[in-house]
Amino acid sequence: MRIGHGFDVHAFGGEGPIIIGGVRISYEKGLLAHSDGDVALHALTDALLGAAALGDIGKLFPDTDPAFKGADSRELLREAWRRIQAKGYTLGNVDVTIIAQAPKMLPHIPQMRVFIAEDLGCHMDDVNVKATTTEKLGFTGRGEGIACEAVALLMKAAK
């Protein structure tokens, strides 16, 4: 078994909506990013890549490459997952924690789980997504941005 951890942050800027966990969420602010700014899928992709010792999302999809300008993070996740499977790994489970004072994530979590399970080709029981606030402390609490942490467990596929 191998475990990976991912973390991502994006500052608010411009106008919404935002995309979190592949879900378009109405919000008055947007997120500043080279791609679509999906902190949940970026953290998850990093966790998966880390568990497989394949570096990180910035190495695989550099923000200096114009090809990834405005990229759909679901596509990035699927490409990373293909590379991980090519190394002979299967998924144990993933757990994602979104850290945001606003907007509220709870109504969107079921669809996030559906999208992640689809992208990883796994059962929804292998995908957990939750959200928390920082009780108005720090940059997320002040409404300056959104953060996310994720962990992923991989196993070598049986031969």
UniProtKB/Swiss-Prot annotation:
Binds 1 divalent metal cation per subunit. Pathway: Isoprenoid biosynthesis; isopentenyl diphosphate biosynthesis via DXP pathway; isopentenyl diphosphate from 1-deoxy-D-xylulose 5-phosphate: step 4/6. The record marks 34, 133 as: Transition state stabilizer. PROSITE patterns: ISPF. Belongs to the IspF family. It comes from Salmonella dublin (strain CT_02021853). InterPro entries: MECDP_synthase, MECDP_synthase_CS, MECDP_synthase_sf. It is an enzyme of class 4 (lyase). Involved in the biosynthesis of isopentenyl diphosphate (IPP) and dimethylallyl diphosphate (DMAPP), two major building blocks of isoprenoid compounds. Catalyzes the conversion of 4-diphosphocytidyl-2-C-methyl-D-erythritol 2-phosphate (CDP-ME2P) to 2-C-methyl-D-erythritol 2,4-cyclodiphosphate (ME-CPP) with a corresponding release of cytidine 5-monophosphate (CMP). Its cofactor is a divalent metal cation. 4-CDP-2-C-methyl-D-erythritol 2-phosphate binds at residues 8-10, 34-35, 56-58, 61-65, 100-106, 132-135, 139, 142. This is 2-C-methyl-D-erythritol 2,4-cyclodiphosphate synthase. HAMAP family: IspF (MF_00107).
